[in-house]
Amino acid sequence: MCGDRNWKDASLIDSCLMSLVYDIAVNGGGPLVIIAGVAKGADSIAEDRARYHNIELDLYPAQWHLYGRAAGPRRNQQMLDEGQPGLVVAFHDDLENSKGTADMVRRAKKAGVPVIHVSHKNPGGDRLTN
């Protein structure tokens, strides 16, 4: 999960998490592991909600002190390479003007990982194609 550092809507993230849990329970698959980048906003809310629901977390903090401005994109690629997600869920109300979230979405699409973009305009999410 990734998203806007200014995202505050925990209920929408929680709803998405519960939908994923339900989908895995009904359709098989799993286990569900939330991969997040230890950032403010959507990432930290996803981490908090995952802990609340006892969902496994795989965290990738950006190493700003080592890589400066390149730390975010490096972390995003690391989450894809090491975490090997089956799905990326991006929470952002203005994805087109985003930096970090848009970078993660681009990288996921390039890697062939399905992406769902969730916003307040479309809380059910839009599946983005590669």
Kindly label every feature range from the protein language model.
Residues 1-5:
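Short, hydrophobic/glycine-enriched beta-strand segments
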Residues 6-130:
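Acidic/glycine-enriched connector segments
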